[in-house]
A protein has these predicted regions:
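Glycine-rich N-terminal segment of FAD-binding domains in flavoprotein oxidoreductases
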Residues: 39, 43-63
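ATP/nucleoside-binding phosphotransfer catalytic cores, i.e., glycine-rich phosphate-binding loops
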Residues: 2, 194-196, 200-247
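N-terminal glycine-/serine-/threonine-rich phosphate-binding loop
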Residues: 1-47
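Glycine-rich beta-strand-to-loop/alpha-helix junction loops that act as flexible
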Residues: 49-54, 144-148, 209
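Short, conserved loop/helix-junction motifs that constitute active-site signature segments
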Residues: 65-73, 102-103, 167-168, 196-201, ...
Length: 247
């Protein structure tokens, strides 16, 4: 039987392999400790999170941990260009699954502030979102996800402006991504933090469950590749990244 590939820690990359039953609870505890330390050091903490279904269980584990949530600012890594009240809004998902229980006191920084249509054009939304992120301050913890296609945030392979969004010399905080066609499961224009902004975080976490994404992760582990955007996060040496992998 062929041996299953398994990543190993290296440089600024740390691999935590835990059971699928405990991953979200253990990662939530790690995040909460980092936020509490930031509050102790600076008087506030910034948590930047991704949307989609993958982080829901993590959010629900995190929201019941006792820290001073009134001093936590929650920002978004990316957003669909829909009103913040829309069922597919990442902000709404965060409000529903994270900003409940003890975490209800946290402050959510919207990427798309509008509550109804029509919204400004995506480039204008990205510009406003970038200003809001800068006002919120540096993320102490930034939670990424990875799709089976290797995308992270709204940095999708095939986007016509992907190389610009991944360029560390790019001074934009957020960008409107040009996706043709848009993702089938959520066919909306997207705005996203650029790679440079993502890497400005003090600590990045990437939780992965299941084995279906391991082949993509293995490719990303080897070298930076525009076809696998998450590879640019894994290949850099600027920012600590913790991969939380369910065994």
């Amino acid at each position: 039987m062929a041996q299953t590939w398994h990543p190993e820690s290296r440089g600024t990359l740390t691999v935590h392999t835990v059971s699928s039953a405990t991953l979200n609870v253990r990662l939530a505890q790690d995040i909460a400790q980092r936020l509490a330390a930031a509050i102790q050091a600076r008087g506030f903490a910034v948590l930047s999170v991704s949307g989609g279904k993958s982080p829901v269980a993590l959010f629900e584990a995190l929201r019941v941990i006792a820290i001073d949530w009134s001093r936590v600012r929650v920002t978004l890594v990316d957003e669909r260009c829909v009103p913040r009240t829309h069922p597919d809004s990442n902000a709404r998902l965060v409000q529903t699954h994270l900003l409940q229980d003890l975490a209800a006191q946290a402050q959510l920084v919207f990427m798309v502030a509008g509550a109804s249509e029509p919204l400004p054009a995506p480039p204008l939304l990205a510009q406003a979102a970038g200003m809001a992120l800068l006002a919120a301050n540096t993320a102490d913890v930034l939670v990424l996800g990875m799709g089976a296609d290797g995308h992270t945030a709204s940095l999708f392979p095939g986007a016509s402006n992907l190389a610009e969004a991944l360029d560390l010399c790019n001074t934009q905080t957020c960008m409107a991504m040009v996706l043709t066609p848009p993702p089938a499961n959520a066919p909306y224009p997207r705005i996203t933090q650029t790679l440079a902004q993502i890497l400005s975080a003090r600590h990045i976490v990437l939780p992965l469950t299941g084995t279906d994404k391991l082949p993509t992760l293995q490719q990303a582990w080897g070298a930076a590749n525009l076809a696998i955007p998450i590879s640019f996060v894994l290949q850099q040496t600027q920012t600590p990244v913790a991969l939380w992998l369910a065994n």
